[in-house]
A protein has these predicted regions:
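Regulatory and interdomain segments flanking nucleotide-handling catalytic cores
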Residues: 1-222
Length: 222
């Protein structure tokens, strides 16, 4: 864990500081650098998980639950890896992932925030295209300095998570902008009937959409 943390900090600080003399800025002037908001504690949260998992047919219900849970787990892992690749970072920057959400420690730079914003938008467009409004990803972050990560003063570390939670809650309350709502209302569906599993209008095979068919097929292998 220590090595992973050191690797995470080594990959983050240079993006913020942009210096060559790190001995001067981080060690000799350590106290000053501890107060600089060099980091972003960032989180992504997939909402709609419970409804998605428990939207299953009566036949093979247990396998269906496992398949949908596994699918969401793998999806989050892929999302994390894709975002880290866009940021030119490694999984050393991943603090936690599980249960449809994750936490990452990133550099607090304009470039990082731009990448995060664009990725969140593109990800939710993809979610809408494949799952309509069933799944949505809300993201949030808090700017942090080294002292806050050390919980100095006491309570400052938990305050970071409260800030993130508030940002994510606000986004969940206002999921879509006007353009996305217009797109939803004007979309032409491929099919005319509802999938008997997820109730989404789509092109069906055996009364099931392609997503539900694929998950049903996968359930036999896990």
């Amino acid at each position: 864990d220590v090595r992973r943390t050191v690797t995470c900090l080594q990959s983050t600080i240079p993006d913020v500081k942009g210096e060559k003399n790190y001995k001067q800025s981080l060690f000799i002037n350590a106290e000053k650098s501890y107060d600089e908001e060099m980091f972003l504690l960032y989180s992504m949260d997939i909402s709609g998980i419970q409804s998605f998992i428990y939207t299953i047919g009566e036949k093979g219900a247990l396998k269906g639950l496992r398949a949908r849970s596994f699918y969401l787990e793998i999806m989050m892992e892929h999302i994390v890896d894709e975002l880290l690749e866009k940021l030119s970072l490694s999984r050393a920057n991943l603090i936690y992932t599980g249960g449809g959400h994750c936490y990452l420690l990133l550099a607090n730079t304009d470039d990082t925030r731009d990448i995060l914003e664009h990725y969140e938008k593109s990800l939710n467009h993809w979610m809408m295209e494949h799952f309509d409004t069933a799944l949505y990803v809300a993201c949030g972050y808090a700017k942090a300095n080294a002292n806050a990560l050390r919980n100095m003063p006491k309570g400052s570390y938990s305050d970071l998570y409260l800030t993130i939670s508030k940002m994510i809650s606000e986004k969940k309350s206002n999921r879509y902008n006007a353009d996305m709502i217009r797109n939803l209302n004007s979309r032409k569906h491929e099919g005319e009937r509802e999938c008997k599993v997820c109730r989404r209008i789509a092109r069906l095979t055996d009364d099931k959409c392609q997503v539900c068919l694929a998950l049903e097929k996968m359930s036999g292998s896990i």
